[in-house]
């Protein structure tokens, strides 16, 4: 990976012409035109702006609040938005289950829940109800309530695609390239 790049939904992107001080959320929505990631509270409390982020050091992907991060902070990282996890034509098992079992009404908060659930299920194959509640603690929903969301998670059918090993490999390659660049 090049020095001023990030991986966004498996695509390497040069961000050298973007403002490193803009919020990651604004960059995702305004420059990349990915509107699944939303601004709810702009304080990191609601989960509407959630993305999956893998640090440069190759650590595991974790949910992060894109409204609290500057674009310059994620150089060398892998970032996944809800668009990188599924689509209208090919929804992920999580998206299918939320739709099928009434885990979404207006849909504003749904992308954040999909991010949180994806992270949970990639770290824990058979989560308990307590695990599910813990994973969803940073997400707010004003319409559906939480019971249908939890029930939809418990009924997910199908393999959850693991994007974690791919992102870790990409980040390790970036770290190696950066080390080579500095050591000549």
Please annotate each region the language model reported:
Residues 174-184:
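Single conserved hydrophobic/aromatic residue that forms the stacking wall/gate
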